[in-house]
UniProtKB/Swiss-Prot annotation:
Residues 1-25, 232-255, 267-292 have a biased composition (Polar residues). Gene3D superfamilies: Transcription Factor, Ets-1 (1.10.150.50). One of its GO terms (cellular component) is cytosol. RNA-binding protein involved in post-transcriptional regulation through transcript degradation. It comes from the Eukaryota. The keyword RNA-binding applies. Belongs to the VTS1 family. Monomer. Binds to RNA. InterPro entries: SAM, SAM/pointed_sf, SMAUG/VTS1_RNA-bind, VTS1_SAM. This is RNA-binding protein VTS1. Residues 1-34, 189-211, 231-317, 398-423, 527-555 are annotated as: Disordered. The gene is vts1. Its main location: cytoplasm.
Length: 620
C-alpha cells in the first residue's frame, strides 16, 4: 500500500520535477528504495520555500511559468543563468518598446496630441518642466523606468548638459530636430499600410518599419540598446539572441504584439501595461481606427508559448484576455461588432426574417448617394469659386417693352406723340463718355426719320456697336422697337434682308457725332456680347456712364485712365509716360511700346485726338 501511494504521488508530481530528478548525478541506490525520497522531495517542493530558492532553472521558466519543484544540486548556476536571461529579456523589451514608440509616433492623431503637449511644454519655466516630468515619471512602470534609465544615460553622454537644461534651446535640441526631420520625410499613409503586414522573416520587425527609420527617429535609444548588447557580448562572450524574430519558434510571449498588452517576464508574472491601463479611454487617437502600436500577427497556435501553461495558474483569466488582445487587430477591417472573417455577413449568422429588416437603411443610403451626387455636380459647375447658374435678378437686362438702359437717366418716360422728344431731363452719352446735348438728340431723331422715309435699305454697310440702344421712336409704332439690344442681336442673322431695319438708319448720323460708323471700321460688332448677356460697353446691369477720357484729374493717373478705356492690359507699357507725351504718340510708336493689337492702337489714337481737341478748346 505504501508503494502504491508512492507511485501515485510520483505520477502527480510536476513534469518539470521529474525532469530535474533525471539531472541528478548517478547513484548506487536502487530505484525502488528511492520512491520514498522522491515522494518526500515532491511534497517539499509543494510546501517548502527553501528548495524553490535554490532550484535549477527548468525550460518552462523560459515561457514565464512559475516553478516550484527544484533540487539543491547545481545551485551555483542559478545566479548567472537568471542574470543572463533577465538581461536578454530587457534588451528584447527595449527593442520592442522602441518599435512601438516609432509606430505610435507615426499616428497622425497622436502627433496632433503630442504637438499640443509640446507647445504647452515650451511655455513652462525650467522648474515647471522639471515638476511636470517628475509627475509624469510617477506614472511609469518598471519596464519604462529601466528603458528610460538606459536612454537617459546615453543622452547624458551625447548631449551637453547646458543644452538639455536650457529652456531657450528646447527647439534646438538635436533629438527634437532629428525626430521632426524623420517624421517629415515619412509618408503616414504608407506607414499605416505597412503596419498591417505580419513579420515575414527573421530580419523583419513586427512593426513593419525600417530599422533606418527607427534609428533616425530615436538615435539615443538605439545607441543605448546597442551599448547594452555590447556589454552583454563582452560579459558572456556571445551576442544576445533575438527571441522575437526566430524562424523556429514564434515567441509571442517575448514579443508582445501590443505595447499596451500584458507581457510575461522571467518570473512568470504578468506585469502591468507599460503605457498604463487607460488606453481605451483616450478621447481622440484610439477611436475610429486601430491604435498605433498594435500590429496584425497570426493568432497563437497550439504550439505557441501560451498553450503549455498549466491550468492551475491564478493568472489564467488574464492570459485569455491577452490572447484576445493579440488577435484583435485582425478584425479592424471588418464591420463593427462582426466576430467573423471579412467574408462573413449578418445574413449567414441568423435566420432569414419574415419582414425586411434593412429596407429603411437602404432608402437612407440612396438619399445619401443622391445628395452626394448633387453636391458633386454643383461643385463641378463652379467657375472661379462661383456657381455658374442663371443670372441674378439684379443683373438681368430690361425687357424690350420696358425701355432701354439709357432711359434709366430719365426722370420721366418719353411721352408718345408726333411732337418728338419732349423737353424732359434726358441724358444721352456716346461710347466715349461724351454727353449729347438736346440739339444732338433732336438731330438724331430727324436723321432716323429721314432714313425711314427714304427706305429701310441702303444703310446696312458698316455695322457698329449700337451707340445708344433703346432710343424710343414713338411715331413709328412697333417697327422701331428693334432698337433694343435683344432685338438687334436677334435680327443680326437677317442682315441681308433688312439691314436698315436693324440699324434704324443710324449709321449716317453716327459719323457726324463721332458715335461709331466708319470711324470704327477696325471693330465691327456682331452683337455677340448681347447674346452672351453682356452690355455693349462691357458693364453688367450698370447705368453708370463711363468716365470722360478728357477729364484732367483722370489724365494725371495713366493707369486709371487706361482702365477707363478698357485698355488696362497696356498699363505696364505706358504708365511711365505723362499724358502730354502720351497723346503725341502715333501708330508706329504705340506698336513699339508694345501695343500690338490694331484695334487698341486705333482706339488710343482716337482718344488722343479727343484729348488734343479738348486741350485746344481749353478744357484741359
Amino acid at each position: 500500500m505504501l508503494n502504491m501511494s508512492n507511485i501515485m504521488s510520483n505520477r502527480n508530481s510536476t513534469p518539470e520535477a521529474s525532469n530535474v530528478s533525471s539531472l541528478r548525478p548517478p547513484s548506487s541506490r536502487a530505484i525502488g528504495s528511492n520512491h520514498g525520497l522522491r515522494a518526500s522531495a515532491d511534497v517539499a517542493a509543494l510546501t517548502g520555500a527553501q528548495a524553490a530558492a535554490s532550484r535549477i532553472r527548468p525550460s518552462s521558466d523560459f515561457y514565464g511559468q512559475p516553478q516550484s519543484g527544484q533540487v539543491q544540486g547545481n545551485a551555483e548556476l542559478d545566479p548567472q543563468d537568471k542574470l543572463a536571461q533577465q538581461w536578454i529579456a530587457d534588451i528584447d523589451q527595449y527593442e520592442t518598446t522602441l518599435e512601438e514608440m516609432a509606430a505610435a509616433t507615426l499616428d497622425q492623431d497622436f502627433k496632433d496630441e503630442l504637438s499640443a503637449i509640446e507647445q504647452w511644454f515650451r511655455v513652462l519655466s525650467e522648474a515647471e518642466r522639471t515638476a511636470a516630468l517628475y509627475a509624469l515619471l510617477q506614472q511609469t512602470t518598471q519596464v519604462q523606468i529601466r528603458f528610460f534609465i538606459q536612454v537617459l544615460q546615453q543622452m547624458g553622454k551625447n548631449h551637453p548638459m547646458s543644452g538639455v537644461l536650457s529652456p531657450a534651446n528646447f527647439d534646438k535640441d538635436p533629438m527634437s530636430s532629428r525626430l521632426s526631420d524623420a517624421m517629415g520625410k515619412l509618408e503616414v499613409g504608407s506607414a499605416r499600410n505597412s503596419l498591417a503586414r505580419p513579420s515575414g522573416g527573421a530580419n523583419k520587425r513586427h512593426s513593419g518599419l525600417d530599422q533606418t527609420t527607427i534609428n533616425t527617429m530615436f538615435p539615443d535609444a538605439v545607441a543605448a540598446i546597442a551599448t547594452e548588447k555590447a556589454k552583454f557580448t563582452q560579459q558572456t562572450g556571445n551576442p544576445p539572441p533575438s527571441n522575437r524574430n526566430s524562424l523556429v519558434d514564434n515567441r509571442n510571449s517575448l514579443a508582445a504584439p501590443t505595447v499596451s498588452g500584458p507581457k510575461d517576464d522571467i518570473n512568470g508574472q504578468n506585469p502591468a501595461s507599460p503605457w498604463g491601463p487607460s488606453d481605451t479611454s483616450r478621447p481622440k487617437s484610439s477611436t475610429g481606427q486601430t491604435p498605433m502600436g498594435q500590429f496584425v500577427q497570426p493568432p497563437p497556435s497550439a504550439g505557441g508559448l501560451r498553450s503549455p501553461r498549466p491550468p492551475q495558474l491564478s493568472s489564467n483569466t488574464n492570459i485569455q484576455s491577452t490572447t484576445l488582445t493579440a488577435a484583435e487587430p485582425q478584425l479592424t477591417e471588418l464591420p463593427l461588432l462582426s466576430p467573423y472573417t471579412s467574408s462573413g455577413n449578418w445574413a449567414s449568422m441568423v435566420n432569414t426574417p419574415m419582414v425586411p429588416t434593412f429596407g429603411q437603411t437602404q432608402g437612407n443610403n440612396a438619399d445619401m448617394v443622391a445628395n452626394a451626387t448633387a453636391m458633386k455636380l454643383a461643385a463641378l459647375s463652379t467657375v472661379n469659386n462661383r456657381f455658374a447658374l442663371d443670372d441674378a435678378r439684379r443683373y438681368r437686362r430690361a425687357r424690350s417693352n420696358d425701355g432701354a438702359p439709357g432711359q434709366s437717366h430719365a426722370q420721366h418716360p418719353l411721352s408718345p406723340g408726333p411732337q418728338g422728344i419732349p423737353s424732359t431731363n434726358v441724358v444721352m452719352i456716346n461710347e466715349h463718355g461724351q454727353v449729347l446735348s438736346h440739339d444732338h438728340v433732336l438731330a438724331l431723331q430727324q436723321q432716323q426719320q429721314q432714313g425711314l422715309q427714304q427706305g429701310l435699305g441702303g444703310f446696312g454697310g458698316h455695322r457698329s456697336r449700337p451707340t445708344s440702344p433703346g432710343i424710343a421712336m414713338p411715331n413709328y409704332g412697333s417697327a422701331l422697337q428693334f432698337t433694343s439690344p435683344q432685338n438687334n442681336g436677334f435680327l443680326s442673322a437677317y442682315d441681308g434682308g433688312a439691314p436698315g431695319l436693324i440699324n434704324n438708319g443710324l449709321v449716317p448720323m453716327m459719323g457726324q457725332f463721332n458715335l461709331g460708323g466708319h470711324h470704327a471700321e477696325g471693330y465691327l460688332s456682331d452683337h455677340s456680347e448681347i447674346n452672351r448677356g453682356r452690355s455693349p460697353r462691357g458693364r453688367r446691369g450698370s447705368s453708370k456712364p463711363p468716365e470722360d477720357p478728357t477729364d484732367p484729374t483722370l489724365l494725371q493717373d495713366i493707369p486709371s485712365w487706361l482702365r477707363s478705356l478698357r485698355l488696362h492690359k497696356y498699363t505696364d507699357n505706358l504708365k511711365d509716360m505723362k499724358w502730354t507725351d502720351l497723346i503725341e504718340l502715333d501708330d508706329k510708336q504705340l506698336e513699339e511700346r508694345g501695343v500690338n493689337a490694331l484695334g487698341a492702337r486705333r482706339k488710343m489714337l482716337k482718344v488722343f485726338e479727343q484729348v488734343k481737341e479738348a486741350k485746344k478748346e481749353g478744357k484741359i
